């Protein structure tokens, strides 16, 4: 009754309201940054930010397994994009040392990789960025509500103030809709005026923003949810070992590689018939012959849920 069901326009016209301001302030505090900016999706946050910050005179250095939204942002930016082998810091340094020191260089990485659940060595990336005068950008889509005490990869690696750009989503741990960017005030003010995916999109609904704000408050003020999540991760790790499945879990993403597309689909269908949703991930999302079942553990799962 107070805010209506829709936003009525883009953020720069009539779509902003006090709930946006409250959520963006809360996100900035949650990520230990000066300001934050909400986008309609995580995809739009990545595409809009990367394409706004770089052009054909600049360099982007990107992990080979980064999310499609990062890849598309690199393409739209027209920057010279150089790919380093997955989490390989020797390869990253070899690329950086051969680039002009004074040119704009942006190192971009997922923090938790969506298909394997492994964690980027953000501390080493930050060190190399400082050494070679590069900016750093981390996508915390799968780390917010997971790493550290729930605040994400920067907290996990104790890098507050040392990562230039933090991105995240409101649709995973926060169970709402949207994405966000957090960083210095000058960064956010620049994106407000330059990020086309922000400028030319109707704003999120008040219900989306209000639910995100409440969910963020729960994570920020109650560590028990993150503790329960890691209890569940440990429980699943034990179950996998008991069944001779050798996977070392560090996050809630559990990839069970079956190689064959058909086998992945068949297993997923049989599980679905037993009321278990386990996604069959196939090319082009993963490489050929790397089809898998991806289990996503949450704090809301009971041991009975997980012991299927």
Which positions does each model-derived feature cover?
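Conserved N-terminal alpha-helix of the aminotransferase class I/II PLP-enzyme fold
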Residues: 3-41, 233
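Amphipathic alpha-helix from the class-I
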Residues: 207-227, 238-241
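Active-site PLP attachment segment
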Residues: 155-190
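Conserved PLP-anchoring active-site segment centered on the Schiff-base-forming lysine
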Residues: 49-68
């Amino acid at each position: 009754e107070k805010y209506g069901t829709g936003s009525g326009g883009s953020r720069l016209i009539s779509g902003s309201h006090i709930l946006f301001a409250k959520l963006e302030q809360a996100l900035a505090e949650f990520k230990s940054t000066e300001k934050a900016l909400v986008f309609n999706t995580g995809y739009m946050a990545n595409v809009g930010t990367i394409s706004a910050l770089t052009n054909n005179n600049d360099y982007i250095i990107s992990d080979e397994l980064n999310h499609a939204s990062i890849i598309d942002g690199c393409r739209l930016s027209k920057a010279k994009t150089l790919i380093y082998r997955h989490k390989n810091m020797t390869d990253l340094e070899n690329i950086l040392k051969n680039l002009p020191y004074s040119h704009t260089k942006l190192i971009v990485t997922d923090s938790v990789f969506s298909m394997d659940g492994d964690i980027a060595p953000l501390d080493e990336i930050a060190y190399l960025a400082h050494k070679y005068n590069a900016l750093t950008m981390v996508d915390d889509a799968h780390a917010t509500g997971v790493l550290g005490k729930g605040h994400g990869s920067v907290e996990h690696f104790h890098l507050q103030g040392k990562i230039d750009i933090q991105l995240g989503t409101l649709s995973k741990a926060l169970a709402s809709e949207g994405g966000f960017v957090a960083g210095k005030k000058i960064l956010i003010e620049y994106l407000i005026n330059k990020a086309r995916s922000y400028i030319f999109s109707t704003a999120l609904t008040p219900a989306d923003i209000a639910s995100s704000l409440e969910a963020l408050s729960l994570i920020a003020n109650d560590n028990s949810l993150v503790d329960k999540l890691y209890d569940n991760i440990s429980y699943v790790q034990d179950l996998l070992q008991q069944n001779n499945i050798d996977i070392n879990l560090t996050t809630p993403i559990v990839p069970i590689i079956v190689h064959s597309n058909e086998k992945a689909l068949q297993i997923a269908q049989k599980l679905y018939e037993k009321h278990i949703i386990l996604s069959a991930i196939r090319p082009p999302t993963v490489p050929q012959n790397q089809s898998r079942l991806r289990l996503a553990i949450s704090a809301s799962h009971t041991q009975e849920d997980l012991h299927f």
